[in-house]
C-alpha cells in the first residue's frame, strides 16, 4: 500500500476501505507516512468529504493510537461533555459539579484555549494550587470519592489526533466536518465515559458559522458515539455573543461561583440547567429544569465544586478573592438604544490582546485580565451608561477603548431583542 495512492483515491472522491484507513493512521503515527502526504490527504478530505463509515473507521483507528481510560471501577453511568468552543464559555465549571450533585459521576478531560476561544483548564489553573495534571488512578479515585473531576487531556490519549490537529492548524484544514468529528469523538471515546453531551456552538464566535453546518457536525458526532455504544446527544447553541458576563480566566471563575450560588444572570443559569437536565437524562436520572435549579440555589452544586477544588490541590481562600489588576476601565455607551450585537469573535480577540488568551500555544496567560459586560444583547442602554468594564495590567490606550466601542452595536429602537441559547437538540 502507498500513501500517494490513497491520496489520489480520496482526491478523486472515492471511498477508502477500512484497511486503507487503518494503514494510513498507523503509518502516520509511526512516521512512515510523512507530514506532507498526510496534509495532502487532509486537503483531499476537505474538498471531497468522507462517508459515515469512513469517518467511523478513522475515529476508531485514531482511538487505538493511544491510551484508553477504563472507568468501569466507578459505579453508575459516567457522563462527559464537550464544547466545540466559544467566548466566555465557563459552562463546564458549573455544569460538572451541578450534575455530580445528583450523584451522577462526571469524569471530564478538558483542553486549553487558543485564539479567541477560552479553555476550561486555563480557567481552573487561575485558582491557586489547582492541579490539572492527574494520573488515571488519581482521576478515577477522585470521581469515586466526590463524584467529579476535571483534568487536562493526557498526552498519551489519541496520539494520532495530536499530530493531525497540529498539521491541520497550519494547512488550512481545521474546518472540515469529518476531521473535526473524528478529532472530538476519538478523544471522548478514549476518555471512557458511558454517555456524552456535545455542545456544538454556532455563530460569529464559533467554528461553525451556520446552523446547517452545526447540524451536520452534531449529527455526525452523535452517529459516531452511538456506533460505539456511547449514549450521545448534541445541542446546537448560540455563540454570536459571549456567553454570560465575563471573558477572562479569573473573571470567569468568579462568574461561575456567582451562578453556583444561585446569583447568576437568568439567561446563562437557565441555559446551564437545561444542559444539566439533558446530561442527567443520559444517566437515566429524570429531573425538571426547576428541580435542577434547586441545586444551584441550595448550595449543593457549589459544595461539589469546592470539593473538586480541594481534591485537586486548590486554595479555597484564593478561590473567592477578587481579581487584582492595575487598571479597570469603564466603557460607556455612545448612544441611546438597544444592544443589537456583541460580536463574540471580536471580544474574544480583544481579551486575547489583554493577555487573557493565546495567539500561539506557547504564549503565557495573564489570568487576571479580561472583560465584564454590564449589558448584553437585547438590553436597553442610555448614552454614557456603562456597557462593560475592561480589566488590564497594562495601560489601556484611547484607541483600544475606541475599538471596544466600535464592536458594540446599538440599535435605535424600543424593541426588545430576544436571544436564545439552545437552538436545536439532536439525539
Regions found by a protein language model. Give the residues of each.
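Short beta-strand segments
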Residues: 109, 143, 151-153, 184, ...
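Short acidic, glycine/serine/threonine-rich loops at helix termini
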Residues: 92, 110, 117-122, 154, ...
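Alpha-helix C-terminal capping segments
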Residues: 47-48, 93-107, 187-192, 227-228, ...
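A glycine-rich helix N-cap at a beta->alpha junction
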Residues: 123-149, 219-225, 229
Amino acid at each position: 500500500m502507498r500513501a500517494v495512492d490513497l491520496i489520489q483515491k480520496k482526491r478523486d472522491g472515492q471511498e477508502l476501505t477500512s484497511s486503507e484507513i487503518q494503514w494510513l493512521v498507523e503509518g502516520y503515527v509511526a512516521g512512515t507516512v510523512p507530514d506532507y502526504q498526510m496534509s495532502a490527504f487532509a486537503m483531499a478530505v476537505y474538498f471531497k468529504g468522507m462517508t459515515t463509515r469512513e469517518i467511523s473507521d478513522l475515529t476508531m483507528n485514531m482511538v487505538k493510537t493511544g491510551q484508553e481510560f477504563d472507568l468501569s471501577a466507578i459505579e453508575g453511568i459516567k457522563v462527559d461533555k464537550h464544547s466545540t468552543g466559544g467566548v466566555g464559555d465557563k459552562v463546564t465549571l458549573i455544569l460538572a459539579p451541578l450534575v455530580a450533585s445528583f450523584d451522577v459521576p462526571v469524569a471530564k478531560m478538558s483542553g486549553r484555549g487558543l485564539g479567541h476561544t477560552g479553555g476550561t483548564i486555563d480557567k481552573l489553573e487561575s485558582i491557586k494550587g489547582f492541579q490539572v495534571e492527574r494520573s488515571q488512578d488519581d482521576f478515577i479515585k477522585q470521581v469515586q470519592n466526590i463524584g467529579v473531576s476535571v483534568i487536562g487531556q493526557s498526552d498519551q490519549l489519541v496520539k494520532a489526533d495530536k499530530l493531525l490537529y497540529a498539521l491541520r492548524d497550519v494547512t488550512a484544514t481545521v474546518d472540515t466536518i469529518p476531521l473535526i468529528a473524528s478529532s472530538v469523538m476519538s478523544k471522548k471515546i478514549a476518555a471512557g465515559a458511558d454517555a456524552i453531551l456535545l455542545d456544538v456552538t454556532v455563530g460569529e464566535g464559533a467554528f461553525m458559522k451556520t446552523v446547517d453546518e452545526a447540524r451536520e457536525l452534531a449529527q455526525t458526532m452523535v452517529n459516531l458515539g452511538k456506533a460505539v455504544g456511547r449514549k450521545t446527544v448534541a445541542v446546537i447553541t448560540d455563540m454570536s455573543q459571549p456567553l454570560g458576563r465575563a471573558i477572562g480566566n479569573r473573571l470567569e471563575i468568579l462568574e461561575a461561583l456567582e451562578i453556583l450560588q444561585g446569583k447568576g444572570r437568568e439567561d446563562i443559569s437557565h441555559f446551564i440547567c437545561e444542559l444539566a437536565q439533558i446530561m442527567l437524562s443520559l444517566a437515566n436520572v429524570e429531573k425538571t429544569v426547576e428541580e435542577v435549579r434547586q441545586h444551584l440555589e441550595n448550595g449543593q452544586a457549589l459544595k461539589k465544586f469546592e470539593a473538586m477544588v480541594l481534591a485537586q490541590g486548590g486554595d479555597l481562600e484564593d478561590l473567592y478573592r477578587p481579581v487584582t489588576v492595575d487598571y479597570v476601565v469603564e466603557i460607556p455607551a455612545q448612544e441611546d438604544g438597544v444592544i443589537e450585537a456583541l460580536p463574540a469573535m471580536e471580544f474574544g480577540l480583544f481579551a486575547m490582546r489583554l493577555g487573557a488568551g493565546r495567539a500561539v500555544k506557547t504564549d503565557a496567560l495573564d489570568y487576571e485580565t479580561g472583560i465584564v459586560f454590564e449589558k448584553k444583547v437585547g438590553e436597553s442602554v442610555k448614552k454614557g451608561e456603562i456597557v462593560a468594564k475592561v480589566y488590564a495590567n497594562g495601560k489601556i490606550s484611547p484607541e483600544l477603548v475606541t475599538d471596544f466601542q466600535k464592536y458594540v452595536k446599538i440599535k435605535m429602537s424600543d424593541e426588545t431583542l430576544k436571544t436564545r441559547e439552545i437552538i436545536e437538540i439532536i439525539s
